[in-house]
């Protein structure tokens, strides 16, 4: 009886916190197996769901635990049901029959799909900046055209948009081998259209694209400013697929409403489904990416070296990958296996060709720029006064110190008048949450970051 009350309370809290689509995907699909010795065993059908439960829902498990059991309940996640999986297997099989995967058409050879095999969900590093985009991509790969159509993912270069597109396609083909899937950059789609138009083979072009189950278009902003005929053809392709309930996933470097040079009717259609953004990885995610990229290279990247590298590049993953390539080249030439900070610094200096460009940001510089922006002195920031403008400036400065430097939590706390590390954690979480809700604050922080760098 208590277990049922406990789980219902968790679902109530989750419904308040998550969007409807995320609630359906993360909460409804989860299942409480048992509560024993203050541990709640929770079944999640996908291991990728654990991050959202840990980051977004763990605290509500604690709250529900005190309400129902008068004890702190710790979650333990499992990804295989201990027994009786028959019903779920039947349900999964039923779900797969809900979608028509063009059985009358010949499946596309993998080499013609445009997909890259190396990009999967398993090797995509999740973090706070991409968790919702990953969630949406996973949802699409589970239920084509039944969840979000189109799915529109946008963000700066090198943040994983192409990886996610390929992961969706590869996941679908793993589960439904006869699905007709096509990944193509928008520029290549345009060139393909123009080639078929020039050769008088438009029927062949239409058959290729309008018979797909899943169309994955990368960098759709490339369509901006193109001739009317080109945009018209994509518009018709989009409509043909959408009308047949076939899935479309698009990526861009900007949101639909900021796509200039596109017909309004296209922009409107891009917003029909779900739009998700990917933001640059935070410090912890950058370290996780570096660990993933370096673990099979045959070199010993020391932990302080990884932290150093994570502190040098904060904009995208490609910079991190480039730095790793430069470092391994130096290591190969020098015939060394242990990668120290000195080796990493040498590679970065050569890469940037200017030591002054390196991101070594002192916390007092962050405090100065934040203080100037909000009209708060560093002394006030380090103090304990709780006036609203001082609290905001203090929390923003702590947030940026966490995001832009590789300093430890205790070190950051010390620089703010000896604050406890939990205060820094709270400030970071608070500002991150506000950024997601308040565009004005997000723009303010972006402006401050530009001044800091």
Swiss-Prot record:
Region entry Domain III, AAA+ region, spans: 114-331
Superkingdom of origin organism: Bacteria
GO CC annotations on file: cytoplasm; plasma membrane
Name assigned to this protein: Chromosomal replication initiator protein DnaA
Gene3D superfamilies associated with the record: 1.10.1750.10, 1.10.8.60, P-loop containing nucleotide triphosphate hydrolases
Region described as Domain I, interacts with DnaA modulators: spans on this chain: 1-74
Recorded GO MF terms: ATP binding; ATP hydrolysis activity; DNA replication origin binding; lipid binding
Keyword vocabulary terms for this entry: ATP-binding, Cytoplasm, DNA replication, DNA-binding, Lipid-binding, Nucleotide-binding
Listed InterPro entries: AAA+_ATPase, Chromosome_initiator_DnaA, Chromosome_initiator_DnaA-like, Chromosome_initiator_DnaA_CS, DnaA_C, DnaA_dom, P-loop_NTPase, Trp_repressor/repl_initiator
Pfam family, one: Bac_DnaA_C
Quaternary organization: Oligomerizes as a right-handed, spiral filament on DNA at oriC. Interacts (via domains I and III) with CcrZ.
Activity regulation remarks: CcrZ stimulates DnaA, possibly by phosphorylation of an intermediate molecule, to initiate DNA replication.
SUPFAM superfamilies, sorted: P-loop containing nucleoside triphosphate hydrolases, TrpR-like
Effect on the protein upon substituting residue 398 to T: Thermosensitive. Many anucleate cells, cells with aberrant septa and mislocalized FtsZ at 40 degrees Celsius
Similarity comment: family membership: Belongs to the DnaA family.
Sequence segments annotated as region (Domain II): 74-113
Gene (name only): dnaA
Compartments it resides in: Cytoplasm
Region ranges (Domain IV, binds dsDNA): 332-453
């Amino acid at each position: 009886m208590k277990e049922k009350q406990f789980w219902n309370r968790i679902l109530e809290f989750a419904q308040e916190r998550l969007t409807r689509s995320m609630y359906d995907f993360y909460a409804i699909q989860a299942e409480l197996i048992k509560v024993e010795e203050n541990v709640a065993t929770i079944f999640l059908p996908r291991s990728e769901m654990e991050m959202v439960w840990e980051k977004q829902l763990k605290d509500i498990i604690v709250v529900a635990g005190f309400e129902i059991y008068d004890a702190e309940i710790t979650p333990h996640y499992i990804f295989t049901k201990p027994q009786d999986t028959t019903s779920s297997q039947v349900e999964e099989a039923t779900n797969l029959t809900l979608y028509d995967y063009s059985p009358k058409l010949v499946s596309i050879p993998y080499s013609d799909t445009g997909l890259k095999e190396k990009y999967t969900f398993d090797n995509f590093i999740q973090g706070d900046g991409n968790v919702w985009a990953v969630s949406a991509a996973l949802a699409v790969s589970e239920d084509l055209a039944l969840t979000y159509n189109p799915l529109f993912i946008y963000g700066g270069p090198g943040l994983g948009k192409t990886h996610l597109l390929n992961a969706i396609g590869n996941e679908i083909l793993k589960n439904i081998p006869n699905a007709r899937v096509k990944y193509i950059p928008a520029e290549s789609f345009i060139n393909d259209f123009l080639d078929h138009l020039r050769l008088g083979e438009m029927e062949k072009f239409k058959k290729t694209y309008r018979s797909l189950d899943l169309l994955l278009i990368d960098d759709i902003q490339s369509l901006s400013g193109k001739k009317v005929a080109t945009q018209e053809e994509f518009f018709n392709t989009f409509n043909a697929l959408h009308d047949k309930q076939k899935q479309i996933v698009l990526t861009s470097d900007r949101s639909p409403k900021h796509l200039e040079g596109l017909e309004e009717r296209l922009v409107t259609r891009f917003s029909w489904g779900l739009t998700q953004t990917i933001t640059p990885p935070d410090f912890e995610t950058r370290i996780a990416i570096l660990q993933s990229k370096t673990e099979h290279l045959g070199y010993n990247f020391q932990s302080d070296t990884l932290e150093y590298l994570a502190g040098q590049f904060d904009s995208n993953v490609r910079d991190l990958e480039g730095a790793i390539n430069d470092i391994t080249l130096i290591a190969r030439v020098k015939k060394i296996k242990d990668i120290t900070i000195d080796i990493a610094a040498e590679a970065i200096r050569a890469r940037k060709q200017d030591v002054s460009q390196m991101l070594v940001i002192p916390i007092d510089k962050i405090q100065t720029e934040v203080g100037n922006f909000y009209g708060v002195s560093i002394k006030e920031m380090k103090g304990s006064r709780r006036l609203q403008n001082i609290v905001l400036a203090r929390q923003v400065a702590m947030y940026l110190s966490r995001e832009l430097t590789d300093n430890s939590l205790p070190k950051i706390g010390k620089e703010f008048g000896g604050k406890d590390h939990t205060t820094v954690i709270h400030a970071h979480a608070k500002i991150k949450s506000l950024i997601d809700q308040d565009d004005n604050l997000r723009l303010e922080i972006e402006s401050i970051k530009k001044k800091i760098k």
